[in-house]
A protein has these predicted regions:
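Conserved anion/nucleotide-ligand pocket segment
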Residues: 133-233
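C-terminal active-site/capping subdomain that shapes the small-molecule cofactor and substrate pocket
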Residues: 269-360
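Buried hydrophobic positions in well-ordered alpha/beta secondary-structure cores of metabolic enzymes
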Residues: 15, 82, 116, 235, ...
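ATP/NTP phosphate-donor binding region
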Residues: 1-78
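Structural motif
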Residues: 81-83, 112, 259-261, 292
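Oxyanion-binding "anion nests"
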Residues: 226-265, 269
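Long, hydrophobic/aromatic-enriched structural stretches that serve as scaffold segments
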Residues: 75-98
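Short, acidic/small-residue loops that bind anionic groups at enzyme active sites
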Residues: 98-124, 131-139, 319-322
Length: 360
């Protein structure tokens, strides 16, 4: 695995828009404020031509223009790290115009984004053996003040941090809108982790069935392996395409084992279950050590009696590995910045989780 150099003091932050740009509110104002904040921290900025573009369908510009920008700015020596302007809908089409051979031959560079940016963070790992950060997009850094998760992501980029923890509360409903573009996360809900582990011979009950451990004092759990994953909506879309080298990646790193992280955006509970089934049957979960599952955007919803827990656990039970759910990953902020492709140790103590990156 190739790990990029950290963002140096007085370095240059590059911004690209392979998915949505920051063309409309509240993202436009938030992105402008993010630039002010990074400039105040001493950094120079290198904005790609699509950062404010609104010419595409589901992305900032045409797939050709987006792919060209992403390749050029990743391989450029004019910036030290890249942050994606935002998520979106059709970044998969951008991938057809990204030169992965050129990226693989270039000096590795930290790329950060989430949601639709799974198309890049996942493929950087599986195609290029290059680590990236599944974390906040550029406009989020415009909030006043920064949430702790934004500081974590920034310090991870700078090399000032090699571990992340869960946060006390999460945002069920955002207050940010066109008239209030710089509001911080509206964290109102206490984080309550759900911990499912295979039953052993000494715990009673049917051996091998998943049981839920209380996220309370006295409960401890540790996992170690290589992180891989992203937004399920995007992951299952890549499955079976020419970009799908996931099974080969898992085989290449089988001695480490894979810790999958997953979260869902548009998918309802049935959609999540179908996607998990497809990934499982495609062999993606070979050499798996465990699963880190973020709160789905459709949190708390049921679909014909199926909830978010059974949508995942029923199908993954036979893999006989721990499944940690309702984590700070994904679309219901805040989110722990995760190093895609990174080797990590996950430690759970009660309702607390810590991820230590062991190779940074």
């Amino acid at each position: 695995m190739r790990y990029p150099k950290y963002l140096p003091e007085q370095g240059t932050i590059g911004f690209v828009a392979p998915s949505f740009g920051c063309a409309i509110e509240p993202y436009h104002t938030a992105f402008l404020n993010a630039q002010k904040k990074f400039t105040a921290l001493g950094y120079s900025l290198d904005l790609g031509p699509n950062c404010y573009a609104d010419k595409g369908i589901g992305i900032s510009n045409t797939p050709e223009a987006c792919g060209r920008e992403l390749t050029e700015y990743y391989c450029s020596n004019k910036n030290d790290v890249l942050i994606s302007c935002g998520g979106g809908e059709l970044m998969c089409e951008t991938m057809d115009y990204v030169d992965f051979e050129q990226i693989k031959a270039a000096e590795p560079k930290w790329y950060m984004g989430f949601s639709d940016n799974t198309n890049m963070t996942f493929l950087l790992a599986t195609l290029c053996d290059t680590a990236s950060i599944y974390g906040p997009c550029a406009a989020a850094f415009g909030m006043e003040p920064w949430h702790e998760s934004l500081t974590d992501a920034y310090e991870l980029l700078c090399g000032k941090k090699d571990s992340v923890c869960g946060y006390e509360q999460w945002e069920k409903e955002s207050l940010k809108d066109e008239e209030h573009p710089l509001l911080p996360y509206n964290v109102t809900e206490p984080r309550k982790m759900r911990i499912f582990v295979p039953q052993n011979e000494n715990s009673g009950g049917e051996h091998g069935r998943l049981i839920e451990l209380p996220a309370a004092q006295g409960t401890t759990l540790e996992l170690e392996g290589r992180l891989l994953g992203g937004c399920i909506d995007c992951l299952v879309n890549l499955l079976g395409t020419k970009y799908d080298k996931t099974v080969e990646f898992a085989e290449r790193y089988k001695e480490d084992g894979i810790i999958w992280y997953m979260e869902a955006c548009d998918l309802n509970m049935m959609g999540i279950r179908r996607a998990v089934w497809q990934m499982k049957r495609a062999g993606w979960f070979s050499h798996v050590k465990g699963f880190l599952v973020g709160r789905p955007a459709q949190f708390g919803q049921e679909w014909i009696g199926l909830d978010q827990y059974h949508a995942v656990c029923d199908l993954l039970e036979e893999l006989q590995v721990p499944i940690l759910m309702d984590l700070d990953i994904g679309h219901l902020a805040p989110m722990m910045p995760l190093v895609s492709g990174g080797y990590a140790k996950v430690a759970v103590t009660g309702n607390d989780i810590r991820i230590n990156y062991l190779e940074l």
